[in-house]
Amino acid sequence: VSRRLPSTPPNLPGFSFIRVLGSGGFADVFLYEQNMPRRLVAVKVLLAEVVNDEVRQMFQAEANLMAQLSSHPSILTVYQASVAADGRPYLVMEYCSATLGQRYRAVQLPLAEVLSIGVRIASAVETAHRQGVLHRDIKPSNILTTAYGHPVLSDFGIAATLGQAEASDAVGLSVPWSAPEVLLDEVAGTVASEVWSLGATVYSLLAGRSPFEIPGGDNGTVALVGRIERARVPPTGRPDVPRALEAVLARSMSKRPTDRQGSALEFIRDLQAVEEELALPQTPLEVAMDDWALATAVDLDERTRIGAGTSVAAASGRSRRRRAGASA
């Protein structure tokens, strides 16, 4: 299937266009130079043909959620959001030159680095959960690397708030890192499904492939979904990965959500225990504990306050389902 050409970059006062960074289903990302303060920035611009009230609300939700969360050291920083003269909404973000999605398939990442990344990204996810937000698309290509080598979680475009969802809520998802109950449309997303995605992501960074991907085999969507729903988690295949870590990852990807770690925080503690077992420096937990940081989630239409449950209501309402292929 041929990829579409990027849209025309908008004329943004105070910014100079440099080049295209990437294209997605609903938006393009461009590299601009901001004139004051002078710095490189990534600008995410919605496609004109998809802009309607529902999509505009979804984009506004992403901007608000990322602004609320981006003070976290492992969440991508958002600088501003606005609407271009041609009517397209845009988001100005910190520019990161690389993603883990580019690295993990090309080179074997050191075990210590993967454990540290896992703790940091899970800390970001735990912080989001405490503010009532699910990311719902945790995967290697959504982990960027800052100029200082720090991993940051990006793309809250299909994020949602805890408390009020229906299993029928259509969400964008990436099959290789999605929990079986999400693929089966039993839930739109839960804390437990985020734990699955965290485990699948850490596994991918270690193995150089997603957990149920078979090198040289049938990795089409149907085959992959079937293995995710029924097959056991295979070993990473790395001799330097201890049994304790294999067990942590297998537990995080248990078929039954109740058999997984109960939270991103519990997943963090398990990774830190492996660091201790290997006599590695312990990656610090980065979870905000103060009352302000634990305030209720952003609520655009006052329908999505935090509830007692762990299911979600999409901030965008109903958006069409799109399933990414096995490679991303």
Labelled PLM ranges:
Residues 80-82:
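A short, aromatic-enriched beta-strand patch in the conserved N-lobe beta-sheet
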Residues 18-24, 29:
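Protein kinase glycine-rich loop
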Residues 260:
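Conserved HRD-motif arginine in the catalytic loop of eukaryotic-like protein kinases
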Residues 117-118:
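Activation segment signature within eukaryotic-like protein kinase domains
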Residues 121-133:
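Protein kinase catalytic-loop region centered on the HRD/HxD motif
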